Regions:
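N-terminal glycine-/serine-/threonine-rich beta1-alpha1-beta2 phosphate-ribose binding loop
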Residues: 2-103
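Short intrinsically disordered, low-complexity coil segments enriched in acidic
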Residues: 1-2, 116
Length: 141
């Protein structure tokens, strides 16, 4: 099979937080799907998302997504390759970040508190597990 016939790689995302930023992530990925595919040579698909209130109206389409109130369900989902953490704080968010990294899932976070207070631990855990930890926008990005 030559390059033109290969199916495009789909990177599956688990999203923690469906507030303003989380809903925007979904909208941007949906709206820019073709441009992202052309630029990256792969597709990104949010397959599961976590929110405190699943009944709250969202400013994005949640069609086809698995929805949960349990952030660990997102991290433990076997198909999730990248965890995007947008819940903030240093309690459950930190637990989720560490577990995601230890389960060999790449992580992107906008969690200023977790990076400020536990950045060295998170970076060290990511390095030991050969995992990408993205957080630039969380710190004066």
């Amino acid at each position: 099979m030559d390059e033109a016939q290969k199916p495009m790689q789909v990177i599956k995302i688990g999203l923690l937080g469906l507030g303003t930023v989380g809903a925007s992530v979904i909208r941007i990925l949906q709206k820019n799907k073709v441009a992202i595919e052309k630029k990256c040579g792969c597709s990104f698909e949010v397959i599961i998302a976590c929110a405190r209130d699943l009944e709250k109206p969202r400013d994005c389409s949640l069609d086809g997504l698995i929805l949960t109130t349990d952030p660990l369900e997102v991290v433990r989902h076997p198909e999730v390759e990248v965890v995007v953490e947008l819940i903030g704080g240093t309690t459950i968010a930190l637990e989720v970040l560490i577990e995601a990294i230890e389960k060999s899932k790449h992580v992107v976070t906008a969690n200023k508190a977790a990076i400020a207070l536990h950045g060295n631990e998170l970076i060290g855990t990511a390095k030991r597990n050969d995992i990408f930890l993205g957080f630039e926008a969380a710190i004066a990005g």
